[in-house]
């Protein structure tokens, strides 16, 4: 019997976002700018948090890891997409395609867990401030961050295992700008009735668990804020949560639509647009969201600029 993971297709061709040459040039300039802002913004967040003692707190530790994950997430996809905009045929071996998807899923899943951890951090800070140093000790923070990366690797392993047992013996053109699971699955000549469901269950479980943690955390946060007598205290508590809630809404909204909703509910073009949003745009927006609305980050940035340009 032929091995189940035997493939006759040796490489995949990524069709990208568009075949229009003029539009490709425009998109190249736009996405090059977005990628540059992503790298500069997230590296700035990381260096700022590491260099400023006032930002050496659990919240900013998690934010620095979120910035690192955003860099990895965007870098796993954007450079290859930019190559396609230059008019080159983007060809990836099956192994390279699987590797790209594996890396992207790892970072994407870690981001889910980090957003949940950050919600728990805000819950402890606002609802149990006297116990904050105990509940968010360096050891616990290390465990939470480590568990986020382990969870990302486990989910990525589930998706990757499903890809590796597929056979590809027909068309090799992926109608996408990266090796996304649904797009690759369409090219398989294997029975995908079960394989197509397993990753959705894995991704759906992670989304449900992390959203539950976030929802419960913010329910208690809201109750605590409403019971505050001080208007200033309420405003300060709300201001520390709005940035995180914005990031959560943007990220979870898109990944739920792509990986959990039935595929018949949207077209390939809509899938591409949503994928651009969560793989390219959101990693650029996160440092802006967290810095523009955060007084501590803005103050640390001001001091850093003064040190560099006295």
Swiss-Prot record:
Q: Which residues lie on this side of the membrane: Extracellular?
A: 1-25, 76-99, 155-196, 259-271
The record ties this protein, via InterPro entries, to: GPCR_Rhodpsn, GPCR_Rhodpsn_7TM, Olfact_rcpt
Q: Which PROSITE patterns does the UniProt entry name for this protein?
A: G_PROTEIN_RECEP_F1_1, G_PROTEIN_RECEP_F1_2
Organism superkingdom: Eukaryota
Give ranges for the Cytoplasmic compartment.
Answer: 47-54, 121-133, 218-237, 293-310
Q: Name one GO cellular component term.
A: membrane
Ordered alphabetically, the record's keywords are: Cell membrane, Disulfide bond, G-protein coupled receptor, Glycoprotein, Membrane, Olfaction, Receptor, Sensory transduction, Transducer, Transmembrane, Transmembrane helix
Covalent S-S links between cysteines: 97-189
Chain ranges passing through the membrane: 26-46, 55-75, 100-120, 134-154, 197-217, 238-258, 272-292
Asked whether the keyword Disulfide bond is assigned, the reply is yes
Residues carrying covalently attached carbohydrate according to the record: 5, 20, 265
Q: Where in the cell is it found?
A: Cell membrane
Enumerate the GO terms in the molecular function aspect: G protein-coupled receptor activity; olfactory receptor activity
Give the UniProt record's GO annotations in the biological process aspect: G protein-coupled receptor signaling pathway; sensory perception of smell
Claim: Cell membrane is one of the keywords in the record: yes
What's this protein's family per the entry? Belongs to the G-protein coupled receptor 1 family.
Q: What is this protein called?
A: Olfactory receptor 5P56
* Protein's organism: Mus musculus
